[in-house]
């Protein structure tokens, strides 16, 4: 009898253990059908109609937001590439990424900034930025609104710095309409660093589209009192 009871208990334990050993959840790189090299997530797809090359960091705290953006961008591109008439050259989608960090109190931050190049049958190829920022202390995304302390108005300080730096970059005096330079909509892509905040501007936001994408570091010394 004791032997039978022992065998029954052993069988139950083995059955329970086998149920626990479930497959590990997929990483966001696996969800995107990419290859994780340990340092980067590489996604490559090719067809006579298109080429896709995407390079992302292996890890980012807000993986779901990054995954959703990449999936939507890729799927929209594929829809255009596969529904268009044949071309001499395939459509191109190239996405590269750069990471930024800040360790200055009261909160550490981490950011991923994507540079998205698309040649999808338009008059000209386009290159745009998309930034994702993460608050390490509060474990949540940082938006333009939560970047700043409440009841502050940073753009009257930020805009002249941006305009001056863009003039230096272009080698000529840049004139930006105040309604564009003071519009928070144009400052949604940014990365916080120890030195300040880098703002990334897409073509047509502050400068004409022909100027392409631009970026400006606004020194921390100019805005530190307004940062949240």
From Swiss-Prot:
Cellular compartments per GO CC: extracellular region; peptidoglycan-based cell wall
Secreted in keyword set: yes
Listed GO biological process terms: cellular response to starvation
One example GO MF annotation: zymogen binding
Compartment list: Secreted
Primary location recorded for the protein, binned into one broad class: secreted
Pfam families per the UniProt record, alphabetical: DUF3298
Leader sequence residues: 1-23
Xref: InterPro entries: DUF3298 (IPR021729), Esterase_Immunogenic_RsiV (IPR053421), PdaC/RsiV-like_sf (IPR037126)
Keyword Secreted set for record: yes
Superkingdom of source: Bacteria
Entry keyword set: Secreted, Signal
Family: Belongs to the RsiV family.
UniProt-recorded name of the protein: Immunogenic protein MPT64
Organism (species): Mycobacterium tuberculosis (strain ATCC 25618 / H37Rv)
């Amino acid at each position: 009898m004791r032997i039978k009871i022992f065998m029954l208990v052993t069988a139950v334990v083995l059955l329970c253990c086998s149920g626990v050993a479930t497959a590990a959840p997929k990483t966001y790189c696996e969800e995107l059908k990419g290859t994780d090299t340990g340092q980067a997530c590489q996604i490559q797809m090719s067809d006579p109609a298109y080429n896709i090359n995407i390079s992302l960091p292996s890890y980012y705290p807000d993986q779901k937001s990054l995954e959703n953006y990449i999936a939507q961008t890729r799927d929209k591109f594929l829809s255009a590439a596969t529904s268009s008439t044949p071309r001499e050259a395939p459509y191109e989608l190239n996405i590269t990424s750069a990471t930024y960090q800040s360790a200055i109190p009261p909160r550490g931050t981490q950011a991923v900034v994507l540079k998205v190049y698309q040649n999808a049958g338009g008059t000209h190829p386009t290159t745009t930025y998309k930034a994702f920022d993460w608050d390490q202390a509060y474990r949540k995304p940082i938006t333009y609104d939560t970047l700043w302390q409440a009841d502050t108005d940073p753009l009257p300080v930020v805009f002249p710095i941006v305009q001056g730096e863009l003039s230096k970059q272009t080698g000529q005096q840049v004139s930006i309409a105040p309604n564009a330079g003071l519009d928070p909509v144009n400052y949604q892509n940014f990365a916080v660093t120890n030195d300040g905040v880098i703002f990334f501007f897409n073509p047509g936001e502050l400068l004409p589209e022909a100027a392409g994408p631009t970026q400006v570091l606004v020194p921390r010394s100019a805005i530190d009192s307004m940062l949240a």
